[in-house]
Each structure stands twice: as structure tokens, then as C-alpha cells.
Amino acid sequence: MRRSDNHHPTVWGDHFLAYANLSGANEWEEKEHEDQKGEVRKMLVLSPSKSLQKLELINTIQLLGVSYHFEHEIEESLSEIYNGYEEWIGKSHDLHVVALSFRLLRQQGYYVSSDVFRKFTDDQGNYNKALVNDTHGLLSLYEAAQFRVHDEEILDEAINFTTTHLNLLLPKLSNSLSMQVSYALKYPINKTMARAATRKYISFYQEEKSSCDQLLINFAKLDFNILQKMYKREMCDITRWWKELDLVNELGFARDRVVELYFWSLGVYFEPQYKVARNILTKVLCFVSITDDIYDTYGTLHELTLLTNAIERRNIDAIENLTSYMKLFYTALLHFYDEVEKELEKENKSFRVNFAISEMKKLVRAYFQEAKWYHGNTVPKMEEEYMKNGIQSSASPTLATASWLGMGDEATKEAFEWISTEPPILVASSNIARLLNDIVSHEREIERGDVASSIECYMKEYGATKEEAYMEIRKIIENNWKDLNRGCLKPTTVPRVLLMPVLNLTRVAEFVYKDEDAYTFSKNNLKDVIFMVLDDPIEE
């Protein structure tokens, strides 16, 4: 018997095809952009090396989404702060300074000890009551604590303390600061999509003109709008490809979400140099989404057996046993990977595609296992069955590997071999994505008869209530964030530039699965965010 989820149609249609002839930045914009960039660089270089001014400038540049222009200068500044950290920050009793420097360094991959916060606690390890009205200090501590690793109870306590007191302060704050704190409580810097956050922070800083140099705001707005034009052209090309592929019309059960998936890839890397990587990743996301719908919704167990075997073979001859709708999908999938291979061959990087296909095979095996659980009405064991399979069914290994396909020379064969072994950072990312998805999909899946989700597995295995299962699974997610944070600290096995897509894929999952499955039900809230990022220029 076939299932159906009756997904709503695309909310975007052919909208982005209208940008086929959109030009990039005009001559004035390019000149203005270069001039302003030079001025911001001067501000960064000339600000005193170990000062709150330098810390806040770096933070603002990052939040406004323009730090990719100044990576060298920011790295130099933070390296200098790291080398003199004990001497400067060790002696400081300003919570905002200590927490901000701690976060900026951890964010950059530097390990600094959380013991630096002990000076703000009493003998029992509780934070001093004198801090409860220090809004900027609390907000900085809250953001810093999101970068915690295991055995940092002082940061675990910091999250409880700051969350409680920032919520209590909200009614007393100015409108702009209140909006900023509310946004941070829902979307902390370490757990949100950079482009969506940038759009918000530009508006926050515009409201609070005194706290940020007007030149910097103007530069951020101009940069945002120039990039947005580029995204519109990219989205136009991808929409055309999607229409020519025509799979969702042929497969009426599949979610038509190409714009949402481009937005997903933008969460992984938004910078101009990743144009090719974004294009490939978006297309892989499209195939993963359709594969999910075939295995999760439409395919019979017999059909899924045949498709799994065909994908394992990766040979057009395997098509003969497939049903007509699967033939279309399978042919398109093989053609796509062949095309990517041809493109990468020009740069002697075609070896990458074999790694990507290998991950795709693991993904369909995991989807097939879930289908067998469904058809057998089986509730698997939480740890050794469900979570083990969930590493792959989260699609994170497939997407992380695919995210490297169009990247630069740092994505070596050794790096691909490393990620194919499921290193801890990838397992953590996968666990987070799997469990976040499970939480927001649970009620809907129960209605349609799915029993194999982490919530159901946990309830059955531990005799827990639904609420207890949710609480425990949120704890597991937080513990995996600690593993992920640890995996991003130097020294790393592969260059950090390769770890960023893994981290950013996790951030996208946190963003998309915050209150609901915003990908599946994109007409609810996600469409407004996508409109702001992809379609709505900021008034200059």
C-alpha cells in the first residue's frame, strides 16, 4: 500500500526565472564597495590590538556578514589576543570583555579555558547576583557558553543563568536591544544560519545607530545587496535546471522545494567563491529530498528493494527492473553524477565523485532500513539500531561529502577518505540533524503510522512518557553540540575551511527544525526568511 503526505505545492513557482537578465553590481556600486571595504579594513587595522574596541569591531564585522573580506586581518588580530590572553583577559573583571573575547577565540578554533569565568561565581559555582542587570555582559556570556565542550559545568550553568535573567530583563530593555536579545535567545550565533542572521543584525544595528559606525552599516548593506543579486542569478539557473529535469511533475508525491534547498546550501556557504560548490550541493539536496520521499512515502517495499540494488550497482543496465517513475529518477540521478564527474575531471578532481556516490549508497541503505522497520511495524533499539542507522539517514554524511565537491584544492583525497570514516564531528552533526528532525516530525509521523523514530524508540526502551523522551533527546542534542564544538578546535585533522560546511549544515538543521519542519511546510514561516535573504534588497 502506498502512503501519501499531500505536500503543499511550491510557494515560489517560476519566480526566479524573472532574473535571467539581471546584471551584477554596476560600476558605481563596485567602486563604492571597494572604497568602503578599504575604509573598514583601515578601521580594523588601526584599532588598538588588545582593546574592547577591537573585539567589538571584529564581532560587528562578523555579525554584519562581511568578515569574509577581512579573514587575514581578523585571524592576525585574534592570534595576537590569544597569545596575550592570560595577561589581558585573565585580569579583566568586565564580563562583556571576558565573554566576548572567549567566544571570538573559540569561534576561530582557539581553545581557551572556561576557568576564566570562575571570577564571576561564588564558592558554590553560582554566578554572582550583581551580574543580573548587566544586559551586554549576560548576552555575551550566553553567546560564549554556546561554544562549550564536555566537562565545562561553569558554561552549562552560564546557559541556565543567562537564559533566565535575559528573559526577565526583556520588558525593561529598549525596543532595539529587546529585539536583539529575543533573537539571540531563539537563534544563538553558534546555532543559526549566517545569512538569515546577517539580515536581522543589519536591521538591529540600524536601529541602534550609536553602537556601530555608519560606514560599516553602509558597507554591510551594499555587500548584502550585491551578493543578493548574485544569488538571484544563481537561483534563476537552478530553477531552469529543475524545470528541465521535471521530476516533481512526473513524481507527483515529491516535495517541490528547489528554492528552499538553494537557501539550505546558502546556509553552508554564502560567499562568492563558493558559487560552483553551492550549485552542486543544491542539486544533491534536490536528489536527496526526492530519494527521501520515495523511501519515506511512496515506494512499496518491493520497489524499494529494486531501487536500492540499482543504486548500489550505479549502472544504467539496472534500470530494467524498475517501475516507470523510478526509471525517471534513477536515470536523472546517474546523469547528474556523470555530469559532475565530467566537470571535475577538467581540474583533476573527478575522484571526489566516487566518495559522494559511496555516501549516497549508504544513505539509501539507511532509508531502506527505515522502510523495513515501517513495513514490519518494528520499533528498533534506540542506541545500537536507530541511532546507528540515523547517522546515515540524517543525510549529513551525504551532504557534508557533497559540500566539498565544488570546493578548492584543500579538499584532497585524504580529506575525503577521512570524512568517509565517520569522524566524531560528522557523527555529532548527524545525530543533531536526525534528532531535531525527529522532534518536529513526531506527531505527524505517529498519525501516519510510523513507529521508528527516536521519540518512540526512547519511550518504548525506557518506559518514558513523550515529554520525558523529548527532554532526554534535547539533552542528547546538547551533548552532541559539545562534541561538534570540540571537533572545530585547533589542531584539526583537516583544514578548518573543510569543517565549516559540516558545522554549517548542523546550523541549518537547527534553523529549519526550530519550531516545525519548516522545509516540508515552507509556506508557513520559511518563505518570509527566504524572501528577505534572496529577494528583498535592503534600502540604502
Curated annotation (Swiss-Prot):
Sequence motif DDXXD motif, location on chain? 292-296
Keywords, ordered alphabetically = Lyase, Magnesium, Metal-binding
Q: Which cofactor does it need?
A: Mg(2+); Mn(2+)
Q: Where does Mg(2+) 2 bind?
A: D292, D296
Q: Say what the protein does.
A: Sesquiterpene synthase involved in the biosynthesis of volatile compounds. Mediates the conversion of (2E,6E)-farnesyl diphosphate (FPP) into germacrene A.
Please provide the record's free-text comment about the domains of this protein: The Asp-Asp-Xaa-Xaa-Asp/Glu (DDXXD/E) motif is important for the catalytic activity, presumably through binding to Mg(2+).
Family, per entry: Belongs to the terpene synthase family. Tpsa subfamily.
What would be the name of the gene that encodes this protein? TPS15b
Give the Enzyme Commission number: 4.2.3.-
Instruction: Name any one GO molecular function.
Output: magnesium ion binding
Name of this protein? Sesquiterpene synthase 15b
Pathway the protein contributes to: Secondary metabolite biosynthesis; terpenoid biosynthesis
State the source organism's domain of life. Eukaryota
In terms of SUPFAM superfamilies, this protein maps to: Terpenoid cyclases/Protein prenyltransferases, Terpenoid synthases
